[in-house]
Structure formats: C-alpha cells, structure tokens
C-alpha cells in the first residue's frame, strides 16, 4: 500500500463535489483552543559544547496539530513557531559560546494537505518543502517518502539539495538522470557526505544513511548499508579524524543497521565522538552504542523536537566516556517560550522569519483549499485509543458506516448483499471532534486503493476469510511475520509504532499511572539512555490492539447465501490465498477478481461526512 501512496488528491467525484452551497466552509485554518492548559517544561535543557536540535518524519505537519482534544494541543506549534524557537536558541548558543546544530532525518512528504493536497500536475511536497528550506538546517537526510515517486526524488535533487549547499545527504541513495549527451547516469540525490566546520571551528564529518529500503520508484537506487560501508568513497570520507562524526539518517536507532556504520567508523577511529540522529519508526528512542556516542530518534509528525548535547574532551587519550544529554520536547508555544528554554514572552517570541513562515503556510492551505469542510465530526474517532469495535473507533466508522454508504452511492451492484473487507492500516491518523476538512481527510485516510470484489461467495466463507486473515495460528503467524518484514522493508512502520504505544500503555498500567488525573495525555518515553527523556510529564495514551483486517456489518442473510465479497486492491493476493484455505469447493484465482467501484479509499470519509455530519 505504501508503494501506492497518494500522488494526487484526485478530482472529487460527482457524488460529493463541492457546489459552494450551504454547509460548506472555505475559511482560514485556525488552531483550536486546548481542552486543558498546556503543561510547561519541567526543567532546563542541559547544554554542552555540541548541541543539536533534531526533527524527523515531519510528513507535512508544518502547521502543527490544530485540534482541541488531547494530545493534539501538545503539538500545536507550527513551523513558524519552530523557526522562531531555533532563532532564539541560536542566540543563546552564541551567548554561551557553544555550538548549536539543526538536523533533520527525512520524510518530508505524505502526511497532510500541505504536502499532499496540491493541484493536478504539481509535485507532492514541492511547495511545503520550500518552507523547511527557510530554516537554517545544518544537515538534512533523505527519507523513504522522498523515494516512492520519481518526481518527488527529482524535486529533492533539483530544488532542495542545492539550497543545502552540499549538506542534503543521501549516502546510499542515487537517482538516474540523463546527462548532457543524453546518456543515463546514476548520481547521489544529494551528497554522499559532508565535511564542514561549526561556528566554533570544530570539524564535522556527516553522513546521511537510509535503511535497506526496497519500495523506491524506478530510476532511484538504494544501496544496502552493509555494502555502502565497503565503498571506497565511504572509507575515504571517514579516513581523516574530525572532532565528531554526525550521522543523520532515515533509519531507526534500534533494531536496524546503524551498528554497521558505527563499527566501520570505530575500526578507524576508536574514540572519536559519534552522534547519530535517526528516524523512520515514528517513536521517541535513545541508546548509546558506546560511552562516546549517542543515538537519538525524535518521533513523527512534528509531535517531537529532539535535543542532544555533549561536552567534548581535549585529553589526547580520549579514553573516558563522554557526558551526553537528550530531551524530547513537545512542539508548542508554551514549550518554545518557556523560561527554561528561550525565556521569551509571547510579545517578544515571534521573529520576522517565523511570522513570515506561518503566514506563508496559512496561505498555502488557502491555495490548496484545505479547509473545505465536509461536515462536523460529533466526537473523536481514534485508531487505538478506544476498543475496536466501538462508537469511538475510526476503524468501526470506516468499515461499518462510511465505506458501505460510500459504495452504495458509487457502485452498480448496491442491490446485491455484500461483505466488505479492508486493512486497518488504510487509516493513518485519528479524527477529532469538530470540523472535518479536506486536510483532515488527507491526514486520516490518504491511500488511493480502489475496491474489487468476487461475486457469489457464500456469506460464511467471506466471514471465515476475515477471521482467518486475522488469526494467530502458528503457520498464519509465520506468514504474518514474513509479511510484516516485507512491509517494513517497503517502508511501513505501523507495526513498530503500535508496539511502542502498546508498551507505553502496559507500563502505565503496571505503575498505576492511570490514576494521575492531573496530567494531560501524551507520550511517556522509556528508552535506553540515562535519566528521563521527556521534557513534559504526561499520562500515556490508552491503547487497544486492533486487528490487521476489519469488516463491514455482515448482510442479514443466511450463511449459504451467495454475496459479493468486496475488498480493497491492497489485499487481493492475501485474500485469494486465504479463500482457498477456508473452503475447498472452488479454487479461486486472481481471474475471479473484478472491479467493484473506482471509488478510492481516500474519498470514503468525505462522502460519508457530507451525508452524516451536516
């Protein structure tokens, strides 16, 4: 599914096209007032000789999270607010006479309307990335979401990389282009490495490494990490000793291949500090591969701004462990303005650049008509914060209400009983109470799968197929793990992110944190680094497990009644395979599959909202 990511917000179907009539609003986006006051940071940041502000996996969330239900207000700061924060922090670094670097670890595309809501003929993220380029990033690294569509990769190569002056890094990613003689050449999307000096004159060798990604588009190439570290250019790049290595890459700091890069450097430089800024799995995480290194991963969707600091030693032996600190900041104006951080009041906080970025992003939202309103959601619909099925479950809403209604209006077979099966991963983000806009639809349900069906399937066989696809029998579990690994290689991090949420919730139950009624909902991080990483103390989000596949309400017919078995194109192969396990009367093949509707899953919620939420 991720390989078929949203490339264009398609022309809205006639069934729900906007006629600018009553009930539809096209207004300027606004941040909602939080349902409770925001909690300020708990303690000062620890500064060192080297300090890093880190972002990763922003996925277009440049106007912040604008809903009133927690935890959304924790992350309500927009990119303009962040730019002002960075500016003030740079001033503090100068006063302290230390270095402060700004680093990003990739995935700028695919997440909100600012990146994905562009008009036909444009390129995903082209406009939104311009605003990121206005910040003083010292290093940016490529992510897998820059590689699903060749046009996006080319845009990064032609438009973002030049603005970074050699510091947009793609150590193991190439793009295929035609040279002046019209011959194809493979060259790095950005730069393979960068060497530069900090404001204080410290020498830095930087790399930008992506995980072993296999879902990239044609005419792009991702080299395996284990092969990259054997390349002559890599060995030459790390030959000379800098004051520290800066490894900024789109790869999680746990359970992946950073140790391959780390060990290759350690084989040459046994004690040189190595600072790793990872990403991709959307979690807050930290570990130390040795006493002179730290690895930090800073969440997703501008829900986290990471902080890392260390003080270097001048001893020739460099045998002692270094002292590191890390912090996970909630990106909102209370955090940014806090006396522990910038100590700026609301009056003096906003910089000219920050205000310009905010105004530009708001204008982009207007240009893309992102606040076109389909209806008003009566309450929150979340993916994992409530049980499935339930009235507050987005999965229940999508499978049991929205999809059946949308298909009934967009199929020529509505008079035939059907059962609909979709993958729960089709829903990417929660829906919160209040206006449901074009931006909310792009955020919650971005994938462009269409609906297929197999006719004349017994009702019981269809229901058994869903059950079998979700079962955890040993053989099924093995197949599930194999599919999960394949999905991970193609860029799907949902399983790891959900595991992280589950662990967080389980720890809170064991520690009795649920009774802390004075705390607001948010992330509660346990990582492998010393001390407490979270800048603000929260009570963790409740977590309920969800199945991989969900179904509509079964039709009110007998079990042997022949029905239309409807499903999204993403699950075709697995569904046909499972059909042949749960029954033996017929050998199903892909030849039995036909198009049920050209309606895309990304359109379903808008159709339903116009019907039910007005």
Segment roles from a protein language model:
Residues 1-9:
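Classical eukaryotic N-terminal signal peptides for Sec-dependent ER targeting/secretion
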Residues 329:
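Glycine-rich, flexible beta-strand/loop modules in the N-terminal catalytic cores of phosphate-handling
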Residues 2, 16-307, 312-317, 388-414, ...:
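N-terminal catalytic scaffold of extracellular/periplasmic and nuclease hydrolases
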Residues 16-53, 74-77, 87, 91-100, ...:
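Non-catalytic terminal accessory segments
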């Amino acid at each position: 599914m991720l390989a078929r990511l949203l490339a264009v917000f398609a022309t809205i179907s006639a069934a729900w096209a906007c006629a600018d009539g009553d009930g539809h609003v096209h207004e300027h986006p606004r941040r909602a007032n939080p349902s409770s006051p925001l909690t300020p940071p708990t303690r000062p940041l620890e500064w060192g000789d080297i300090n890093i502000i880190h972002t990763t996996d922003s996925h277009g969330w440049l106007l912040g999270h604008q809903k009133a239900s927690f935890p959304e207000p924790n992350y309500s700061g927009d990119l303009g607010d962040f730019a002002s924060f960075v500016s003030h922090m740079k001033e503090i670094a100068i006063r302290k006479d230390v270095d402060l670097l700004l680093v990003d670890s990739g995935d700028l595309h695919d997440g909100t309307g600012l990146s994905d809501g562009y008009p036909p003929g444009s390129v995903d993220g082209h406009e939104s990335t311009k605003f990121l380029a206005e910040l003083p990033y010292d290093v940016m690294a490529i992510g897998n979401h820059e590689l699903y569509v060749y046009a996006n990769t080319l845009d990064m190569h032609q438009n973002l990389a030049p603005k970074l002056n050699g510091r947009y890094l793609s150590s193991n990613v190439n793009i295929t282009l035609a040279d002046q003689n019209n011959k194809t050449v493979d060259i790095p999307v950005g730069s393979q490495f960068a060497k530069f000096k900090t404001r204080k004159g410290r020498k830095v060798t930087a790399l930008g490494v992506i995980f072993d990604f296999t879902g990239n588009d044609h005419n792009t190439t991702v080299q395996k990490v284990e092969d990259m570290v054997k390349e002559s250019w890599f060995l030459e790049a790390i030959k000379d000793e800098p004051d520290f290595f800066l490894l900024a890459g789109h790869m999680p700091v746990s359970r992946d291949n950073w140790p391959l890069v780390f060990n290759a450097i350690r084989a040459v430089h046994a004690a040189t500090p190595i600072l790793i800024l990872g990403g991709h799995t959307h979690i807050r995480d930290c570990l130390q591969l040795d006493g002179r290194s730290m690895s930090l991963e800073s969440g997703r969707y501008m829900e986290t701004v990471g902080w890392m600091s260390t003080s270097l030693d001048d001893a020739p032996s460099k045998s002692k462990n270094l002292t590191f600190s890390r912090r996970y900041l909630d990106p909102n104006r209370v955090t940014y303005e806090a006396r522990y951080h910038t100590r700026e009041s609301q009056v003096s906080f906003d910089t000219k650049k920050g205000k310009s970025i905010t105004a530009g992003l708001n204008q982009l939202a207007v240009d893309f008509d992102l606040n076109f309103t389909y209806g008003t959601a009566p309450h929150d619909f979340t993916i994992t914060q409530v049980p499935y099925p339930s009235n507050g479950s987005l999965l229940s809403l999508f499978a049991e209400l929205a999809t059946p209604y949308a298909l009934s209006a967009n199929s020529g077979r509505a008079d035939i009983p059907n059962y609909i099966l979709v993958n729960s991963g089709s829903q990417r983000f929660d829906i919160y109470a209040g206006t449901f806009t074009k931006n909310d639809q792009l955020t919650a349900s971005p994938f462009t799968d269409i609906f297929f069906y197999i006719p004349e399937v017994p009702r019981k066989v269809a229901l058994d197929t869903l059950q079998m696809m979700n079962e955890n029998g040993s053989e099924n579990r093995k197949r599930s793990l194999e599919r999960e690994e394949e999905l991970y290689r193609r860029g799907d991090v949902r399983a790891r992110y959900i595991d992280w949420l589950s662990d967080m919730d389980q720890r809170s139950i064991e520690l009795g944190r649920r009774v802390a009624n004075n705390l607001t909902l948010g992330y509660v991080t346990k990582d492998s680094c010393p001390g407490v990483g979270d800048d603000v103390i929260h009570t963790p989000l409740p977590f309920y497990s969800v199945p991989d596949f969900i179904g509509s309400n079964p039709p009110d017919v007998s079990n042997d009644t022949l029905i239309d078995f409807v499903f999204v194109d993403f699950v075709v192969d697995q569904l046909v395979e499972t059909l042949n396990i749960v029954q033996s009367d017929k050998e199903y093949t892909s030849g039995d599959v036909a198009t049920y509707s050209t309606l895309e899953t990304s359109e379903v919620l808008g159709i339903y909202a116009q019907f039910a939420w007005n």
